[in-house]
């Protein structure tokens, strides 16, 4: 209770704040803000046991009998609530919560406003009007499904593409051309089995505004010597700036400038129209969206087929056959339950992506194995070819001999060698052994033997001298005998 009294005396309590608002309505102030309490209107209630009523009882007015209790609200509070509700009602609707129809309607309004602003600021009184457009139709014969179905009785259905429609084209005339005279000249031209037909093609404002982007501007005639950073700095309030170079005129640049909202785009359009930039006047207009020419679509049209009617007497009764609807892709789920597989589209997409990655890795490994196999085969082929080229010649070769009979040719050399061998056997002369160069290993062995038999050389010295003398005498005798035989062979005539 004391805290409430202190709050009321200081003017910080809730009751004091509410009573502060009543001062604007010329009402009497309450005791919470330091003013006097009027006891004539604030009567203390009866306590019943002689206690002094609290000070809070003087702050409330007595409620008359039969009145209805209402919540604590003053007229000022009601006014404040109304003011709080006003900005919420004046707020623009959120585009994310709008339907497609409302969004299309809003975009149509923005494009019409942009087209009107462009016409107002770009079309001047002395400027030539825009060129007229003519629609020229070609005299192509009309092709229908019943006509094609009547070509043969075996035709069940006819599917017509869009390309069978009669052809036409749009022709833009020069500025100031005579439209009526041009139409008459075109209509007199013979084409195929008929004549061309030309007519004026009027474009409504909605048709022209359909291709306008209300948030993007086309800015042309930008100086070529300006850098990209300088051009982007010139459009400081833009969200995005795409810069390009004209194909025909290489001395000028253009830019597509995009803003956050259509209103900002209109303000920028007003500022940029006919504004100078480095001694050049900018060309500004709203960006046009082009419709991309897609692939020729096949249009499933209704066809008429001649069928036999079992209930009718006429055999040529025409029956209208409606072609089936176009097929759509069906996703088959592997789960046991018969639930719709559209909910698991993300999981299926991830699974397919993993399978595709695994297949790619397998194909990559296969390609690497094939490359390695080709390299191994090429190396084997090279090795075989090198072996064929470097095979040693195993045929015996005749080495030069000291024997002069080795120079003889033919069968005489064979007979002479036989005779020499017989004479050697008869005389007891052994076959000559070719002198070989002793190896290092033999030298080592002889050194070892010499080390082992160093003490025996003292006792075997005279004997070794006699044997060496005998060997030299025998060798001399053999050489003399061979010389005699060679001389005899030279003297004997050939048999």
From Swiss-Prot:
Keyword match RNA-binding: yes
GO cellular component, one term: nucleus
Positions with biased composition (Basic and acidic residues): 345-358, 472-495
Name of a matching Pfam family: RRM_1
Subcellular localization: Nucleus; Chromosome
Any GO MF annotation of the entry: RNA binding
Listed SUPFAM superfamilies: RNA-binding domain, RBD (SSF54928)
InterPro entries according to UniProt: Nucleotide-bd_a/b_plait_sf, RBD_domain_sf, RRM_dom
Function text: Probable RNA-binding protein that specifically binds to the fourth chromosome and may bind an RNA that spreads the fourth chromosome. May be a reminiscence of X chromosome dosage compensation of ancestral Drosophila species in which the X and the fourth chromosomes are one single chromosome.
Assembly information from the UniProt record: Interacts with Zeste.
Name of protein: Protein painting of fourth
Organism: Drosophila melanogaster
């Amino acid at each position: 209770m004391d805290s409430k009294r202190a709050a009321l005396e200081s003017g910080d309590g809730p009751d004091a704040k509410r009573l502060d608002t009543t001062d604007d309505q010329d009402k009497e102030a309450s005791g919470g803000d330091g003013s006097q309490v009027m006891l004539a209107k604030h009567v203390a209630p009866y306590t019943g046991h002689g206690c002094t009523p609290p000070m809070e009882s003087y702050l409330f007015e007595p409620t008359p009998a039969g009145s209805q209790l209402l919540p604590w609200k003053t007229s000022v509070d009601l006014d404040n609530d109304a003011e709080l509700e006003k900005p919420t009602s004046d707020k623009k609707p959120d585009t994310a919560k709008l339907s497609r129809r409302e969004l299309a309607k809003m975009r149509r309004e923005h494009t019409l406003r942009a087209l009107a602003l462009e016409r107002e600021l770009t079309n001047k009184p002395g400027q030539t009007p825009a060129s007229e457009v003519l629609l020229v139709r070609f005299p192509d014969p009309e092709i229908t499904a019943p006509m094609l179905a009547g070509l043969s009785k075996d035709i069940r259905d006819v599917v017509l593409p869009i390309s069978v429609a009669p052809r036409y084209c749009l022709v833009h005339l020069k500025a100031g051309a005579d439209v009526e005279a041009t139409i008459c000249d075109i209509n007199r031209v013979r084409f195929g089995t008929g004549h061309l037909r030309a007519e004026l093609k009027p474009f409504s404002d909605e048709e022209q505004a359909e291709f306008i982007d209300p948030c993007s501007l086309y800015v042309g005639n930008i100086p070529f010597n300006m850098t990209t950073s300088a051009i982007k700095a010139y459009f400081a309030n833009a969200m995005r700036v795409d810069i390009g170079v004209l194909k025909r005129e290489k001395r000028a640049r253009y830019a597509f400038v995009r803003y956050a909202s259509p209103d900002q785009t209109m303000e920028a359009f007003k500022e940029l129209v006919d504004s100078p930039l480095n001694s050049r006047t900018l060309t500004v207009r709203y960006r046009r969206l082009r419709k991309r020419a897609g692939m020729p679509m096949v249009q499933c049209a209704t066809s008429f087929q001649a069928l036999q009617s079992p209930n009718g007497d006429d055999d040529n009764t025409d029956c209208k056959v409606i072609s089936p609807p176009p097929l759509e892709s069906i996703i088959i789920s592997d789960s046991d339950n018969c639930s719709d597989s559209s909910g698991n589209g993300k999981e299926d997409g991830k699974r397919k992506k993993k399978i595709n990655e695994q297949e790619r890795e397998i194909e990559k490994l296969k390609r690497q194995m094939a490359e390695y196999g080709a390299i191994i085969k090429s190396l084997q082929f090279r090795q075989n070819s090198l072996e064929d080229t470097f095979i040693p010649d195993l045929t015996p070769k005749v080495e030069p001999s000291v024997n002069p009979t080795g120079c003889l040719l033919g069968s005489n050399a064979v007979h002479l060698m036989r005779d020499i061998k017989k004479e050697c056997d008869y005389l007891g002369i052994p076959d000559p052994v070719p002198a070989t160069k002793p190896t290092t290993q033999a030298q080592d062995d002889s050194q070892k033997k010499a080390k082992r038999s160093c003490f025996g050389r003292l006792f075997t010295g005279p004997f070794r001298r006699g044997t060496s003398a005998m060997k030299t005498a025998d060798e001399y005798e053999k050489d003399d005998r061979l010389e005699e035989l060679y001389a005899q062979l030279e003297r004997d005539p050939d048999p």
